[in-house]
Amino acid sequence: MISTKELRNKFISYFESKNHSHQPSSSLIPFGDDTLLFTNAGMVQFKDVFLGLEKRDFSRAVTVQKCLRAGGKHNDLDNVGYTARHHTFFEMLGNFSFGDYFKKDAISFAWEFLTKEIKLPVEKLWVTIYATDDEAFDVWHNHIGLPKERIIRIDSNDNFWSMGDTGPCGPCTEIFYDHGEDVAGGLPGTPDEDGDRYIEIWNIVFMQFNRHADGTVTDLPKPSVDTGMGLERIAAVLQDVHSNYDIDLFQALIKKAQEVTNADDINSPSLKVVADHIRSCAFLIADGVLPSNEGRGYVLRRIIRRAIRHGNKLGAKDIFFYKLVAELINQMGEAYPQLIDKRELIEKTLIKEEELFLKTIENGIKIFDTEIVSLKSDIISGEIAFRLYDTYGFPLDLTADMAREKGLKVDEEAFKEQMLKQKQRSKEAGKFNVDYNSIINSQAKSDFRGYSTLIEDAKVLEIYQDGQPVNAIQAGSTAVIVLDRTPFYAESGGQVGDKGVLEGVGVEFIVEDVQKSGEAILHIGKLSKGILNTYDEVTARVNDSVRLATAANHSATHLLHKVLKIILGSHAEQKGSLVDDNKLRFDFTHDKAISRVEIEQIETLVNQQIRANYPVATIETSQEKAKSLGAEALFGEKYGDIVRVISMGDFSIELCGGTHVAYTGDIGLFKIVSESGIASGIRRIEAITANKAIKYTFATENKLAAIKEITKSNDSNLLDKLQSMLEQLKNQEKEIAKLKKDILSGANSDIKESSIDGIKLIIANLEGVDIKTLREKIDDYKSKNDKMVAVLSTINADKVQFVIGVSKSITSLIKAGDIAKEFSGYIDGKGGGRPDMAQGGGNNSTNIDKALSDLENHISINIKK
């Protein structure tokens, strides 16, 4: 029997023998593609190649791609554990042609691999083609020799693939394996096609057309091929089992799950859930995702909590999920070394998340069980589901899972309404970023010269206004300029774009931002004088002070990243950064606030590397060579075959395309100005360098000097002096509070109290108190009187403040808010509140006595009505 490990290696070796370049799996987090939550197919890392936006050094590729389907449109989570072939995480075997071979070779490679390399019986294989794809039929029938009756034409979207509403598209051919007559199910295209007898094992997509916005389709100049074969599916075929969960890899994980949960039934769907979910959770964490309440982090949290619930159901009474990581590494660590490298982070993250959820899961399940007893239908309300989510941390799919086991359903639409209301309550304005790739379709190529120069003579290739190409612009126009060569760095890798100017004869274009679109570098800004035409010659001049300040901050992030790993631990991985000329912002994984001592250690070690004045060296080399040098690749970045390596002595080596100083000493000084948490397990450091750090230090020293002058202290006694002053202030505040209380007690004799129809009426203006004291006095009156109206005011610096209290039992007769509005009219102020409590104030204190007298009459009249 061929193992899953052997099958993975055999696939790669076969296509390498056919001159395919073996490319590593890309991250589960798609780089630069906001349309996808997770990588869900092998072609995702080559999307820009297929679109013509990116070029590679090879025309044939083979990959084993990590894929995840557990969120958004592509979501298999609900079915996992209950079917033979649904998974959250799976591996996709794929071979690709970028304008190289086409249908004949693609089909021939697939057939040879299946029938010669892994020796599947020919008589077990069937194929489908798109209904009108006669070329594919000819290859299958006349070249491969497959009988006509085993080639099925399908006239549906199942055999025609497209990347979207527009763009590359084309027919596909699928290869099916026949499990035999003892398994239910019919051929593709028949009413029984959803059975398990005929299983699709390989899909080969022929990208030969380009679909336009008007719906028309034209031929692509260089047709391409995209194929995919699920590793788990083909392993099940080769190991002669009908369920993916019966293959060697899953059986090892299921047995381990049974061991750590004390489960009785090895065939329990819950064991399959746990075995599946450890793969997706471990790989997501290894790729930089941490549990949170939004986005990818929330999908991870949902999967973890679903696994915990199923483990709880199996009999696990304590944390168990992290115990599967060792077996996962045993099964997949050789193919994916990042599992080994990130083992500590994976296990710690799972332990922390499980401990968090175990605090609420038992109570949540009790609430669920209590609620379903009183149900009058088979529908659990959206309100109940939302309560479980909001109070007990139960994701919707977990509640739906529990409901399905009881033969119930959840009103998901009502749940979504509750979620929408919550989002509206906490809605925050989001930052709007322009996606120039989506509005500017430039085919130009700009040659970036900015690593070695800040000034370059160039030619204007294209001009865009409002996303549309134009031939010329007038002074005052905002536009996007594309040059044939440029020293301007385009925003990338967390570093903002350069600023500067494009100058010509009588022409000046102020560059405010720089972005990329494909291979074009976009200079975004405003023409301040002259007329600029396409093909004009200009001098591109980068603002050197901005560039140098930005470079200092960028180089400092490299030092900071390495120092964080030394001080905090190897888990401190970069999660994001922003570098401009003012500051640097660095986000990283760490599960608690950084102490003042650690801040000092970090600053000290970074500044030691600055003073060491290491040369900042740059080399371009292959990814493999870079890894052998110990270069650190950053999460979320996309790298080509040839990468740029930035080294700072032997201290820091990273892959980076940004701009840097020549020596670490050029950074000058590094100073952290803030440290905070931005999400669960994610911390943020903001820091400054060079002149800004020096100015910040001077400003801080000046403030300290001012404090010493005000407090009449020096360096040796400043802290003691401040502590003494704080103690003195606290004592004085206590004395003031006591004096106010005494004043109020003394004023009680001046407070006018009367009774009208059994309702106590209290009215007074009290001197020397604040509004807080008035509120406390009102609360005291209300606690002692069931039927009472109290109006208390005070005057401070000619400003009137008042508080009105009314017992709740009589608010039908008179309301505090109404009295407040009337009171405000006497004092040129404003006031309002609830029926039982209101307050207000004004600037005119001359009428206070008349106001209180008139209010007494007004209240009496209303009570007697």
From Swiss-Prot:
<dbReference type="GO" id="GO:0008270">
    <property type="term" value="F:zinc ion binding"/>
</dbReference>
<dbReference type="GO" id="GO:0006419">
    <property type="term" value="P:alanyl-tRNA aminoacylation"/>
</dbReference>
<dbReference type="InterPro" id="IPR045864">
    <property type="entry name" value="aa-tRNA-synth_II/BPL/LPL"/>
</dbReference>
<keyword id="KW-0067">ATP-binding</keyword>
<keyword id="KW-0479">Metal-binding</keyword>
<dbReference type="InterPro" id="IPR018165">
    <property type="entry name" value="Ala-tRNA-synth_IIc_core"/>
</dbReference>
<feature type="binding site">
    <location>
        <position position="554"/>
    </location>
    <ligand>
        <name>Zn(2+)</name>
    </ligand>
</feature>
<dbReference type="GO" id="GO:0000049">
    <property type="term" value="F:tRNA binding"/>
</dbReference>
<dbReference type="InterPro" id="IPR003156">
    <property type="entry name" value="DHHA1_dom"/>
</dbReference>
<dbReference type="InterPro" id="IPR012947">
    <property type="entry name" value="tRNA_SAD"/>
</dbReference>
<keyword id="KW-0436">Ligase</keyword>
<dbReference type="InterPro" id="IPR018163">
    <property type="entry name" value="Thr/Ala-tRNA-synth_IIc_edit"/>
</dbReference>
<keyword id="KW-0694">RNA-binding</keyword>
<dbReference type="InterPro" id="IPR009000">
    <property type="entry name" value="Transl_B-barrel_sf"/>
</dbReference>
<keyword id="KW-0963">Cytoplasm</keyword>
<dbReference type="GO" id="GO:0002161">
    <property type="term" value="F:aminoacyl-tRNA deacylase activity"/>
</dbReference>
<keyword id="KW-0820">tRNA-binding</keyword>
<keyword id="KW-0862">Zinc</keyword>
<keyword id="KW-0547">Nucleotide-binding</keyword>
<feature type="binding site">
    <location>
        <position position="660"/>
    </location>
    <ligand>
        <name>Zn(2+)</name>
    </ligand>
</feature>
<dbReference type="InterPro" id="IPR018164">
    <property type="entry name" value="Ala-tRNA-synth_IIc_N"/>
</dbReference>
<dbReference type="GO" id="GO:0005524">
    <property type="term" value="F:ATP binding"/>
</dbReference>
<dbReference type="InterPro" id="IPR002318">
    <property type="entry name" value="Ala-tRNA-lgiase_IIc"/>
</dbReference>
<dbReference type="GO" id="GO:0045892">
    <property type="term" value="P:negative regulation of DNA-templated transcription"/>
</dbReference>
<dbReference type="Pfam" id="PF02272">
    <property type="entry name" value="DHHA1"/>
</dbReference>
<dbReference type="InterPro" id="IPR018162">
    <property type="entry name" value="Ala-tRNA-ligase_IIc_anticod-bd"/>
</dbReference>
<dbReference type="GO" id="GO:0004813">
    <property type="term" value="F:alanine-tRNA ligase activity"/>
</dbReference>
<feature type="binding site">
    <location>
        <position position="656"/>
    </location>
    <ligand>
        <name>Zn(2+)</name>
    </ligand>
</feature>
<feature type="binding site">
    <location>
        <position position="558"/>
    </location>
    <ligand>
        <name>Zn(2+)</name>
    </ligand>
</feature>
<dbReference type="InterPro" id="IPR023033">
    <property type="entry name" value="Ala_tRNA_ligase_euk/bac"/>
</dbReference>
<keyword id="KW-0648">Protein biosynthesis</keyword>
<dbReference type="Pfam" id="PF07973">
    <property type="entry name" value="tRNA_SAD"/>
</dbReference>
<keyword id="KW-0030">Aminoacyl-tRNA synthetase</keyword>
<dbReference type="Pfam" id="PF01411">
    <property type="entry name" value="tRNA-synt_2c"/>
</dbReference>
<protein>
    <recommendedName>
        <fullName>Alanine--tRNA ligase</fullName>
        <ecNumber>6.1.1.7</ecNumber>
    </recommendedName>
</protein>
<comment type="function">
    <text>Catalyzes the attachment of alanine to tRNA(Ala) in a two-step reaction: alanine is first activated by ATP to form Ala-AMP and then transferred to the acceptor end of tRNA(Ala). Also edits incorrectly charged Ser-tRNA(Ala) and Gly-tRNA(Ala) via its editing domain.</text>
</comment>
<comment type="similarity">
    <text>Belongs to the class-II aminoacyl-tRNA synthetase family.</text>
</comment>
<dbReference type="GO" id="GO:0005829">
    <property type="term" value="C:cytosol"/>
</dbReference>
<dbReference type="InterPro" id="IPR050058">
    <property type="entry name" value="Ala-tRNA_ligase"/>
</dbReference>
